[in-house]
Amino acid sequence: MQQTLRKLDRAFNDMKSKGMGFPRYKKKIKSFNILGKISVEGKYIKMPLLKNIKFRKSRDIPEGFKIKQIQIIKKASGYYANLMIELDVNVVQPIPHGHAIGIDGGIQSMIATSDGLVLPRPKFLDKALRKIKLLQRKLRNKKKGSNKWNQLNHRIALLHEAVANKRKEYHFNLAHQLCDGVGMIFVENINFVSWSKGLFGKHSLDMGLGQFFNILEYVCSKKDTYFAKVDKNYTSQICPNCGTYTGKKDLSVRVHNCPKCQYIQNRDVAASEVIRSRGLENIAVGTTVNKQPSDGVLAGASA
């Protein structure tokens, strides 16, 4: 009951602060948490009110950590157990140091960095979409609740789970690649919920930029790389070379061409350079998210 109330409270807070939808009921069979005395002995998990359950351990529990709770999750491929472990220790947060990069997220290209790296949008779902649509057409001809209907539903769920696993693996590999040889990473403070409701919502959800930035922040903390978010406004409308406001660009314009200093650069790379400049300026003045000054002068570009 306590866990359910915590989830409900978090759902209402997310609705108010992040613009998410009204909380919906979730099937009990999808996941549930267990508190109390939990221990792992060999290939078995011991939990309150339940028998010893055999499981396949993905990794050893680090020495000194205590198991606080366990989350049982039902997926198409089987049941999974997430162990929440705790250790009373002071975690040192990474400090700004070394080489800095800015990262701009987009639709046509997933990310562009201030070092010139531009990655096209990965199409995780598109590759499996033909199989999914074929199975969904077959599903329409089956009686709901029948064995054939359940079997087809299970096959569709397996395909969606495989797509999600590929997406997550790609995000982790990319995050590690970006952190190599870098001391600071800056990204925009974007509300990706609004992206998912826009014209390119399907592409946005397929890329999973919100998940990627969360994973990137986690990997940065593990690899001693400083991570911070900056103000997202006007990053594509400022020249990173001279700071001139160049005006709003149509999405079809893919090249930044400054009329004042003649600086020419890929539009997304130029935006990532502005993001990097804002991040470095925020460090200099001791803030995390830069705002537009009240006098109307746009912040985030070096003069």
Language-model features, listed with the residues they occupy:
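Generic recognition of long tandem-repeat/solenoid scaffolds
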Residues: 43-48, 79-84, 256
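Generic, well-ordered alpha-helical scaffold segments in large soluble proteins
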Residues: 7, 11-14, 135-138, 177, ...
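Positively charged, low-complexity nucleic-acid-binding target-recognition regions
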Residues: 92, 203, 207-303
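Substrate-contacting helices/loops that form the catalytic groove of nucleic-acid
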Residues: 67-69, 75-213, 284-303
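Short amphipathic beta-strand/extended segments with alternating polar/hydrophobic composition
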Residues: 48-66, 94-97, 118-124, 264-267
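Short acidic-glycine loop/turn motifs at beta-strand connectors
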Residues: 41, 75-76, 114-117, 242, ...
